[in-house]
């Protein structure tokens, strides 16, 4: 609002309608006062004629009241004009206006009206202090009627000195400061000092503000810089440095990414047991394991993504492959195979025995020919939690919610059966048992397992869960039973069950069908296994699946491509002079040679018979049949007496039949006649 927008002349009827306290209420009486005090007038413009009186010729008290009375209307007009002609948001002042809340903007508009009233009075010749007093009195009269907080002259003064030298089109955003505090507290600091302070404070070492300010004072004294107080400097930091810049410079990329709005996902399209996720949880309870060691156990849990029910759990001293494998076995044997599975990229979860063959494992070296792990071998699609800026986003898994405050940490770790064994979530939350902070007593392993099972059941059965699927009406367990009843089932086969019951190891297969396993080795001593079915096979390397709890039982051998080959059994070393063990070994070897030889001969005989079926039959013309001699029959020989000879077989002398030379005269004569006939046949065809 500028001077030209102010109304400069009023008629007696307009003055009467304003109901000013400093003028009579009747138009006739106002006209008489104007005539008596000789107010300056001019002919009224427009219809009706008459006179209009100049505002400046009215008594000063009338002018002030009139200006205050008409300011709201003038303010409304000015606001509309400002909104139409306001600068772009690139203007720093107006950018703050665009970022302010609606409530802050409304309060700024109220303050703007008081500033326009002060400006009108000052421009009409009123002393600025009198203008503050007049505006404050009028504003407080209105606020008393509405039971609102009263305005002080000091606040008006601070607002006025904030805007009086600024262009009027920028007064509105300058009124955004909610308090009436003076702008004198704005930090006055040399640019070099400010840059020095920012480079020191906004660093990854994250120094405290107190320490940084002391360093700044020393540098300012040495360089002659002008610096404000610490509180003023803190306000300047809050005003001039965005929170995002502070987080990045002090904490890094990952912390900055945490400020970004999280993604909200829906699970409505999933079926129960279609997608599961798992993670390990370190319990805050001291447990005495069967071997006598006292540790805080770690449990691996699997959870259904759709309904959030915890499906199975296995616990041990640490997170390892066996707890993950066996807990997955519990889930699949009870509910069938899931289609998808999500886990963290940890050393235990992402090891090759569980995830071998997965190309995007990003842990351990990925080889093109490596053995398939249990999860991909079962046909389950594996998903990793994302890695952002060098750190995992484990919070993306739904099961993480179960580990937060009020979750399984309460239902299990603070179970009645575990009273006195609680270790506290951290060093500052250790319970004070009988005045001895941290004097907790461990519970036995069996008691802990009972508390774990009961705690998980209680967690699953809490009613009215506020998840997308439970919708505040059912528990995790109820939602799962309802949805799993109509879900697609994927039962597990016996061969798939064997994958879960066993671990695997890729080994070198010797020509004699033996191999060594690293599993169960002590020092350099390894278990040796053998399989007669693998002797002489073309497989150089094979995959051996074994039960880690029973390494002295049979193991199963597979090709590197996944085909099942044979079973193998562990062997024991025999003593150097153990003759009985030698005889048993020789007997087993002879039996194997005998049966292998017999099987080879049978196969050869069958192959010869099969080959004869494919040989073309020889057809002769009738005129050549008489030229072919009759087949010569083998002469009948009399039974000959079999002679034996003694042969040394290892440590035993055995009698075997002597080799008899075959007389081949009759056979050779037959061959000559047969070849002669074939030669005649060729000549006849050539003719």
UniProtKB/Swiss-Prot annotation:
SUPFAM superfamilies: Homeodomain-like, mu transposase, C-terminal domain, Putative DNA-binding domain, Ribonuclease H-like. Residues 398-417 bind DNA. This is Mu-like prophage FluMu transposase A. GO terms for molecular function: DNA binding; transposase activity. The keyword DNA-binding applies. InterPro entries: DNA-bd_dom_put_sf, Homeodomain-like_sf, Mu-type_HTH, Mu_I-gamma, Phage_Mu_transposase, RNaseH-like_sf, RNaseH_sf, Transposase-like_Mu_C. Keywords: DNA excision, DNA integration, DNA recombination, DNA-binding, Transposable element, Transposition. It comes from Haemophilus influenzae (strain ATCC 51907 / DSM 11121 / KW20 / Rd). This transposase is essential for integration, replication-transposition, and excision of Mu-like viral DNA. GO terms for biological process: DNA integration; DNA repair; DNA transposition. Residues 8-74 form the HTH Mu-type domain.
């Amino acid at each position: 609002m500028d001077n030209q927008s102010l109304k400069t002349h009023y008629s007696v009827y307009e003055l009467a309608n304003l109901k000013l306290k400093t003028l009579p209420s009747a138009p006739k009486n106002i006209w008489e006062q104007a005539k008596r005090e000789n107010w300056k007038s001019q002919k009224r413009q427009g219809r009706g004629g008459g006179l209009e009186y100049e505002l400046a010729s009215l008594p000063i008290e009338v002018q002030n009241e009139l200006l205050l009375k008409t300011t709201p209307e003038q303010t409304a007009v000015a606001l509309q004009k400002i909104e139409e002609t306001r600068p772009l948001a690139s203007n720093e002042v107006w950018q703050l206006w665009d970022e302010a809340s609606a409530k802050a903007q409304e309060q700024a508009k109220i303050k703007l009206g008081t500033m326009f009233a002060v400006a009108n009075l000052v421009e009409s010749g009123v002393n600025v202090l009198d203008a503050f007093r007049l505006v404050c009195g009028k504003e407080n009269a209105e606020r008393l009627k509405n039971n609102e907080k009263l305005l002080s002259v000091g606040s008006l003064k601070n607002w006025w000195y904030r805007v009086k030298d600024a262009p009027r089109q920028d007064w509105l955003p300058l009124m955004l400061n909610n308090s009436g505090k003076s702008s004198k507290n704005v930090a006055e600091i040399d640019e070099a000092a400010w840059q020095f302070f920012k480079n020191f404070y906004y660093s990854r070492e994250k120094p405290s503000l107190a320490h940084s300010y002391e360093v700044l004072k020393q540098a300012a004294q040495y360089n002659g810089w002008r610096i404000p107080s610490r509180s003023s400097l803190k306000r300047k930091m809050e005003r001039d440095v965005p929170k995002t810049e502070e987080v990045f410079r002090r904490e890094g990329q990952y912390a900055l990414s945490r400020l970004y709005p999280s993604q909200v996902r829906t699970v409505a399209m999933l079926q129960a047991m279609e997608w599961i996720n798992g993670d390990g949880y370190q319990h805050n309870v001291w447990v005495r394991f069967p071997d006598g060691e006292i540790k805080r156990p770690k449990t691996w849990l699997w959870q259904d993504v759709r309904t959030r029910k915890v499906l199975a759990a296995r616990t041990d001293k640490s997170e390892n492959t066996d707890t993950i494998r066996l807990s997955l076995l519990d889930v699949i044997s009870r509910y069938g195979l899931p289609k998808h599975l999500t886990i963290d990229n940890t050393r235990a979860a992402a090891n090759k025995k569980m995830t071998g063959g997965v190309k995007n494992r990003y842990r351990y070296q990925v080889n093109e020919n490596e053995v398939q792990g249990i999860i991909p071998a079962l046909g389950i699609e594996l998903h990793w939690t994302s890695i952002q800026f060098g750190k995992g986003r484990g919070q993306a898994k739904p099961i993480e919610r179960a580990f937060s405050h009020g979750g399984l940490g309460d239902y299990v770790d603070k179970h009645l059966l575990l009273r006195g064994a609680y270790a506290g979530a951290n060093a500052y939350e250790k319970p004070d048992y009988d005045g001895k902070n941290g004097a907790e007593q461990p519970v036995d392993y069996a008691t802990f397992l009972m508390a774990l099972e009961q705690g998980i059941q209680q967690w699953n059965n809490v009613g009215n869960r506020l998840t997308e699927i439970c919708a505040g009406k059912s528990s995790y367990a109820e939602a799962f039973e309802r949805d799993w009843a109509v879900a697609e089932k994927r039962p597990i086969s016996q061969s798939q069950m064997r994958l879960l019951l066993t671990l695997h190891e890729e080994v070198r297969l010797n020509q004699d069908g033996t191999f060594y396993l690293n599993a169960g080795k002590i020092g350099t001593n390894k278990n040796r296994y053998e399989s007669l079915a693998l002797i002489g096979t073309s497989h150089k390397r094979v995959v051996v699946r074994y039960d880690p709890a029973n390494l002295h039982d049979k193991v199963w051998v597979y090709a590197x491509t996944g085909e099942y080959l044979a079973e193998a059994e562990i062997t024991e070393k025999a003593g150097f002079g153990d003759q009985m063990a030698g005889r048993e070994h020789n007997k087993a070897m002879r039996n194997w040679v005998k049966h292998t030889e017999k099987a080879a001969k049978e196969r050869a005989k069958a192959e010869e018979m099969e080959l004869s079926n494919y040989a073309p039959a020889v057809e002769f013309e009738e005129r050549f049949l008489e030229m072919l001699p009759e087949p010569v029959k083998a002469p009948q020989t009399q039974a000959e007496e079999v002679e034996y000879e003694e042969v040394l077989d290892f440590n035993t002398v055995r009698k075997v039949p002597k080799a008899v030379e075959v007389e081949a005269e009759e056979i050779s004569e037959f061959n000559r006649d047969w070849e002669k006939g074939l030669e005649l046949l060729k000549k006849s065809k050539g003719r």
